[in-house]
Amino acid sequence: MSSNDNYIFELPIKVRDYEVDSEGIVNNANYLHYLEHTRHEFCHQAGFSFREMHSQGIDPVLRKVEIEYLTPLGLGEEMISKLNLVRQGVRFIFQQDIYKPDGTPVVKASVICVCIENGKLSRGDILAQRFEKYLNK
């Protein structure tokens, strides 16, 4: 996982009370939710609807997620979730990082998605067309 300063999308998020554990820090599983929420907001703002794509037989699915936990967050803390998108063959790689507002890195993640079309793995060309203006090549 590499750091990336060329983000195409940013989303501010605040830690809610039910996301922290008994130690008062964000439970590690919740970072998956933050990353997913960021991808979904990116897709929504880019004009994509998962429901619409599914009705057309197009389903982006997760293949692999790697997360490096760097700095904990606590109750009420704010964060900025950032995203970049790269295509490598059939894979769409979301390079996602979360930072504190002061720039302290919290999480670095790489999320690999592939595209299923009509129940079968595809090259993802339809998805690539939809993401074309956002893809870093």
Feature names for model-found ranges:
Residues 53-60:
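Short, basic/aromatic beta-hairpin or loop at an interaction surface
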Residues 10, 62-64, 93:
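Short coil/loop residues immediately preceding or within conserved phosphate-binding loops
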Residues 12-14, 66-68, 82-84, 97, ...:
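Residue-level recognition of well-ordered beta-strand positions that form the cores
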Residues 3-7, 44, 74-75, 85-137:
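HotDog/MaoC-like acyl-thioester-processing domains
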Residues 26, 60-62, 106:
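A broad, structural micro-motif
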